């Protein structure tokens, strides 16, 4: 893979029934949205937990000329069970930017180039857009050009580099495959995380998790790390601990133009 091929990869956390036709529509919307934004072909990794869904997914992907390489991991299981067995994770080290997203999350308003710029400028490990339809109010609290630095980010849509992606894999636990509670402990793990509220995604479907099982697994996950409850975590690690106005007018950031941007005497190079 040449250096010109590795700017961006779309990572679909998991996909399958129910509602597969609708989820494929969301996926197609997101892929087209991103291509219209970055104007460059890119690759995709998919975790598919339902064999019956693989063919219609591949058919849709093959209809999109801008999707270059398709890597599909087919296995029955829940999120962490799929990730821990995905044979394609090694290729992720070749990519500058990994766009991690759930199958029922739709992009509403986003500029990938600007999101990357924010991540690099502020040295953020886990960066999320505003999430409409999530659980917590602080994920959608603001509607303007602000960044919320966070100890807790709901895991719907995150921008990573490879090292950040591996951090995310590492903090997950096979005994907590639904991932509940992992988002609460980003401050505990000392992972610099933030929400950029000017861009948004929307959670389009109700959770398919088994709430009783997932909740019990979360309680164990938190207890093993010294926390009695969600409230206990939030008392020690405030979900949003700092809000700043994003200091850049993004109208000048043109996609895929070589551009050096100076922030506090630090040179940031985008679109190498």
Across the structure, where does each feature detected by a protein language model lie?
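Active-site-proximal specificity loops/subdomain of glycosyltransferases
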Residues: 46-96
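Conserved catalytic core of nucleotide-sugar-dependent glycosyltransferases
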Residues: 107-188
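N-proximal low-complexity "stem/linker" segments adjacent to membrane-targeting elements
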Residues: 1-59
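C-terminal catalytic/acceptor-binding lobe
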Residues: 7-30, 176-272
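Short beta-strand-to-loop acidic/aromatic patch adjacent to the donor-nucleotide binding site
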Residues: 93-106
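Short beta-alpha junction loops
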Residues: 48-53, 105, 130-135, 199-200
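A structural signal for short, well-ordered beta-strand segments and their strand-loop junctions
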Residues: 100, 126-130, 193-198
């Amino acid at each position: 893979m040449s250096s010109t091929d590795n700017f961006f990869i779309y990572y679909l956390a998991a996909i399958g029934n129910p509602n597969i036709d609708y989820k494929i529509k969301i996926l197609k919307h997101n892929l087209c949205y991103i291509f219209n934004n970055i104007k460059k072909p890119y690759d995709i990794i998919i975790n598919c937990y339902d064999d019956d869904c693989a063919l219609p997914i591949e058919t849709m992907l093959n209809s999109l000329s801008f999707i270059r390489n398709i890597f599909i991991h087919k296995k029955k299981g829940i999120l962490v069970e799929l990730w821990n067995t995905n044979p394609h994770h090694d290729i992720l080290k070749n990519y500058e930017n990994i766009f991690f997203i759930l199958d029922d999350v739709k992009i509403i308003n986003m500029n990938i180039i600007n999101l990357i710029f924010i991540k690099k400028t502020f040295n953020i490990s886990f960066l999320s857009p505003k999430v409409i339809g999530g659980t917590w109010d602080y994920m959608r609290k603001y509607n303007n050009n602000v960044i919320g630095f966070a100890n807790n980010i709901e895991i719907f849509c995150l921008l990573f580099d490879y090292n950040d992606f591996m951090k995310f894999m590492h903090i997950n636990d096979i005994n907590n495959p639904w991932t509940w509670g992992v988002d609460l402990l980003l401050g505990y793990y000392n992972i610099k995380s933030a929400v950029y509220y000017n861009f948004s995604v929307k959670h389009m479907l109700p959770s398919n998790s088994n709430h009783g099982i997932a909740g019990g697994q979360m309680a164990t996950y938190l207890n093993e790390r010294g926390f009695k409850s969600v409230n206990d975590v939030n008392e020690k690690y405030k979900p949003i601990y700092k809000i700043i106005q994003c200091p850049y007018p993004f109208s000048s950031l043109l996609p895929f133009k070589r551009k050096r941007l100076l922030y506090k005497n630090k040179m940031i190079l985008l679109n190498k």
